């Protein structure tokens, strides 16, 4: 079996050294070249056709964002951004994802080059996962943008806690791009409340929700503890903790609760935990659960349970998934009412809500 050929792009010699050590400890991976800036990255990407590129953003001569844009235009390649775990780092990361990068790894706080080995396993998993991706080039090849302009918007003056459907969306690797294909396509008058469970660091989720809000007719924000679900509102679960939905006896308002339990959860927030909690607060036939691109099986079993109890479930197809792990598991377990490419999911949600 041929090895996964990786191009490392970083202006720090120490970071290039550490990344090479991390990647080459896996027998399935081969580092074919390194680049010190975006210009070298473009040249080596065109010359060597790597399977995966790891990309720094802040570099001399040509930055990572410019390099990503050029590479995705001329030789579409799975690109993983190595970003800072800061608000500024989050904003540039989301810009990189919009330009075509498939995923990111957030560098730990502190002396970055020394701490990069703390995320070694994440880097290895993501490189191997996106190398097999079929969705990266196909999504990039779609000419139309999911949005055309920013939509200025504030919280509705009169919150409406009654809604026809509850839309649950679970997603991991490749999630920001997939969500940009769905949420901006949903109309502002949608008679539904939306909850998104995205595997993402705590410092990233508020920035991501704000960015998604800029392009959406619906009101998008990071969920706060105790916040109510409302018609026309999209809540993004905070990173680093589990989100559950609860409703007090005799009160017809569903609220968000954050909890460190169950402790055995692998992912924080957990899709399974959030999806299962929805079954305790709302009639199953009012639930539309969507499982998108991601590694592993988080959310797959909850999809089975929602479908068995009368809810409607949609799994993203292999055609567009950056990593066809979570949706594939749901399909194989019988948890998908329907399988769709990501660009058809928003329209289908609108049909189901009607």
UniProtKB/Swiss-Prot annotation:
Active site (catalytic residues): 172, 199, 298
Alphabetized Pfam families for the sequence: CheB_methylest (PF01339), Response_reg (PF00072)
EC number of the protein: 3.1.1.61, 3.5.1.44
InterPro entries xrefs: CheB-like (IPR008248), CheB_C (IPR035909), CheY-like_superfamily (IPR011006), Sig_transdc_resp-reg_Me-estase (IPR000673), Sig_transdc_resp-reg_receiver (IPR001789)
Biological process according to GO: chemotaxis
Response regulatory domain sequence ranges: 5-122
Cellular component GO terms held in the UniProt record: cytoplasm
Residue stretches making up the CheB-type methylesterase domain: 159-354
Subcellular localization, as worded in the UniProt entry: Cytoplasm
Highest taxon, organism lineage: Bacteria
Stored CDD domains: CheB_Rec, REC_CheB-like
GO molecular function, one term: protein-glutamine glutaminase activity
Catalytic activity: [protein]-L-glutamate 5-O-methyl ester + H2O = L-glutamyl-[protein] + methanol + H(+); L-glutaminyl-[protein] + H2O = L-glutamyl-[protein] + NH4(+)
Chain segments annotated as coiled-coil in the UniProt record: none
Description of its domains: Contains a C-terminal catalytic domain, and an N-terminal region which modulates catalytic activity.
UniProt protein name: Protein-glutamate methylesterase/protein-glutamine glutaminase 2
Natural source organism: Carboxydothermus hydrogenoformans (strain ATCC BAA-161 / DSM 6008 / Z-2901)
Lineage, top ranks: Bacteria, Bacillati, Bacillota, Clostridia, Thermoanaerobacterales
Name of the coding gene: cheB2
